[in-house]
A protein has these predicted regions:
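Canonical tetratricopeptide repeat
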Residues: 501, 535, 569, 603, ...
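Transmembrane signal-anchor helices characteristic of membrane glycosylation enzymes that use polyprenol
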Residues: 12-31, 47-66, 84-113, 285-303, ...
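Membrane-lumen/periplasm interface segments of specific transmembrane helices
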Residues: 258-262, 279-353, 375-378
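Short acidic/glycine- and proline-prone juxtamembrane loop motifs at membrane-interface regions
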Residues: 114, 203-213
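Extracytoplasmic catalytic/substrate-binding loops of multi-pass membrane glycan-assembly enzymes
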Residues: 105-121, 128-144, 153, 157
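Membrane-interface alpha helices of multi-pass inner-membrane proteins
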Residues: 219, 235-250, 256-260
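Transmembrane-helix motifs of polytopic, lipid-linked glycan transferases
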Residues: 161-182, 220
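Transmembrane-helix signature of polytopic, membrane-embedded enzymes
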Residues: 174-197
Length: 683
């Protein structure tokens, strides 16, 4: 590369840097628009954007006019003397200490992003939910909370401990990898700080969600994979890294293509595949693609949960506000997300364009490209259920491999970058120009509330319900005035909730036609309302249309697979369709989610009695006999079960309870004729 082209690349990269700063300023004046990825300067006063812009320009101007951005680096070999281990250890300890203190001191005080207050409330229960999509994270948080039993706010503290610990672990892993990859201290620090400046870093500041350890695992996977590609580790180390990521979150599956590449490339089989004719390669690719498409279509049609996990290609009955793969809303959200996670991308991309082609050859870059494309594909096709501005954390893991790739490309080709150290400073600075305000906005409660309120006008179907988080925030902070105000706003804007409440009232009054219409209106407001679908299914059972009822219940479960009430309703729909095994499974799933529920047990009793499954029937009877909330029909069933087993004393006590609740005494007289040993205690 000529000196002229080196200088040209620097000038264009500086222009990209300045453009990003200006974009942040523009975003600060448009917080109410879909600029959530770059409007973070807006929440700190009118002068803050201009101060930050001035700092960014002063930094670039100083580096440029001092000649640091135009210094060309002479070609050097990789035989430079190794850095003394003690010196790098001291530097690493200082970095770990600084970041660790920052994670602790600036931990989040508000939890509006992601599903924060909702999952915090769930973890505070006696039987917290562990989602199948994030088993590892869920179990880890449950274990930590139980270990802190007796400590005030143990649920919140468990999130904070895990988040901050994951952050410190991430810093340590990055520094260890930098030490293994590069010899020069400057290169190690640039690579490490580059990775630590990524937008995913907010997850390490006591963030309340189930993604911090998963992001750490993706960081471990990325860096271990890079070391394997460089020949510094055995290729089989990538498998436990993959297993850890998949265990923590289902999105770990996106790492699989990179695993296949590492295991196959540079092997006899891999070299044989590489040597095949072009037609043979295309044929293999076609077969693999067809197999993948076939599997995808099967799962797409077999499971509503799988189908609804993806942004639809075209509008359908579940589309909210026209949000499809090709919609302008989705495209803007993706751009915002990528700017948020990879702030330095424009600068580093410009520098990469001017690198020689040899910079992109080798297993290391092939590994990075496969991995980056795989994880970025997830951000494109996976559905942000809460809306991308709040669900950004679901996709945060995708930023780690891409940021690592860009900074590795920069450091590994430093001899082709004019003013390499200074240009690296600008790229890293861009990351912190976004990350620091984001952290501050969540650490300062007033800023967190202001930021969240700016989100409440973007997605009417999702964000109107999110107003309940403001109520929860003020309740936790014991601000009764703010809580009352938030409740009033929530009621005023919660059109879906009002329609659902109206429908439930009409259903209780046996006005099933009108109730169904209310639920349909709720679905117009929010096409993804699981509550509306499950109650619409109950209406269709009353209309004697069990097949339609079952369809609605399957949709409801696809939208909310973990709700015990919906699972109970699904079991009832299966029961009326005479699919008894699936009904039984659904009811036991409901009880697994909430062991206190009575209704699934009553339905299980009904089914076991109908199918003459005496042993199972008796088992359910024993489990509910002492419950104080049994209605009269259930008490009669329990009493009959005890009579059948000649347990007359228990039967008598059960019937006394039933009589107290209004059971017809004549029934007792009839029972005594066939069971003369039955004695009902006096009132």
């Amino acid at each position: 590369m000529t000196t002229r082209s080196l200088l040209l690349s620097v000038k264009i990269a500086i222009a990209a840097y300045v453009s990003m700063l200006l974009l942040y300023v523009i975003g600060s004046f448009t917080p109410g628009f879909r600029t959530w990825g770059f409007n973070w300067w807006a929440y700190f006063g009118a002068f803050t954007p201009w101060v930050l812009l001035a700092l960014g320009l002063i930094l670039a101007g100083y580096l440029y006019y001092s000649g640091r951005l135009t210094d060309t680096i002479p070609a050097q070999t990789d035989d430079s003397p190794a850095l003394p281990a003690r010196r790098y250890t001291i530097v690493s300890l200082v970095i770990v200490l600084l970041f660790g203190l920052t994670f602790v001191l600036l931990h989040t005080r508000t939890h509006f992003l992601g599903d924060g207050y909702n999952i915090l409330t769930q973890l505070e229960t006696d039987n917290p939910l562990v989602k199948i999509t994030s088993i590892g994270e869920g179990l880890l948080h449950n274990f930590t909370k139980n270990a802190l039993s007796g400590v005030s706010d143990s649920a919140l503290l468990s999130f904070q401990i895990i988040s901050i610990t994951a952050g410190i672990g991430f810093v340590i892993v990055v520094l260890l990898a930098a030490g293994a990859l590069f010899k020069r201290l400057t290169d190690r620090i640039i690579f490490a700080l580059g990775l630590l400046s990524g937008g995913y870093g907010l997850l390490f500041f006591g963030y309340v969600e189930y993604y911090s350890v998963f992001v750490l695992s993706v960081g471990i996977f990325t860096l271990v994979g890079l070391l394997i590609a460089r020949g510094k580790l055995n290729r089989w180390w990538i498998l436990p890294c993959l297993a850890l990521s998949v265990f923590l979150h289902v999105f770990g599956i996106a790492l699989l293509p990179a695993v296949v590449y590492l295991l196959v490339s540079d092997t006899p089989a891999g070299r044989k595949l590489a040597g095949l004719p072009a037609m043979a390669k295309w044929a293999i690719t076609l077969v693999v693609a067809l197999a993948g498409i076939t599997l995808f279509l099967y799962l797409y049609n077999a499971s509503y949960a799988f189908r609804l996990a993806f942004v639809p290609l075209l509008q359908n009955r579940f589309t909210v506000d026209g949000y499809t793969l090709a919609s302008w809303q989705h495209i803007r959200d993706l751009l915002n997300l990528w700017i948020l996670l990879i702030p330095a991308a424009p600068v580093l991309f410009i520098l990469a364009v001017f690198l020689p082609r040899t910079a992109f050859k080798g297993r290391d870059m092939a590994f990075f490209l496969v991995l980056a494309l795989s994880v970025l594909a997830v951000t494109v096709v996976a559905d942000p259920v809460l809306g991308m501005p709040r669900d950004w954390d679901l996709f945060a893991f995708a930023g780690v491999p891409v940021v690592a790739m860009f900074f590795y490309l920069l450091v590994n080709n430093r001899h082709h970058v004019s003013g390499y150290p200074a240009m690296s400073v600008l790229a890293i600075a861009l990351g912190f120009f976004v990350l620091v305000p984001r952290v501050a906005s969540q650490a300062i409660p007033d800023k967190g509330v202001k930021h969240f309120e700016s989100y409440l006008t973007r997605n009417r179907a999702v964000d109107n319900k999110a107003r309940a988080y403001l109520v929860e925030y003020y309740r936790r902070t014991r601000d009764s005035v703010g809580e009352l105000k938030a409740k009033n706003l929530f009621r005023r804007h919660n059109t879906e909730g009002n329609l659902l409440g109206q429908g439930l009232f009409l259903f209780s009054e046996d006005e099933y036609d009108q109730a169904a219409e209310s639920f349909r209106q709720a679905l117009i407001t929010n096409p993804r309302s699981a509550i509306a679908y499950t109650n619409l299914g109950k209406c269709y059972l009353r209309f004697d249309k069990p097949d339609s009822a079952l369809l609605f219940q399957k949709i409801a479960i696809g939208l909310d697979p973990y709700d015990p009430i919906t699972l109970n309703n699904l079991g009832l729909a299966y029961y009326y369709n005479e699919d008894y095994p699936h009904a039984e499974c659904a009811w036991y799933d409901a009880l697994a989610r909430d062991t206190s529920l009575l209704t699934p047990r009553l339905f299980l009793m009904r089914q076991y009695r109908k199918l003459n499954q005496t042993k199972e029937f008796d088992s359910v009877v024993v489990s509910i006999a002492d419950r104080p909330d049994l209605p009269v029909p259930a008490l009669e069933d329990v009493g009959m079960a005890f009579l059948a087993n000649k347990r007359y004393d228990k039967a008598g006590r059960i019937y006394r309870r039933a009589l107290n609740l209004g059971m017809d005494p004549a029934k007792i007289d009839e029972l005594k004729k066939s069971h003369p040993l039955l004695v009902v205690p006096p009132r």
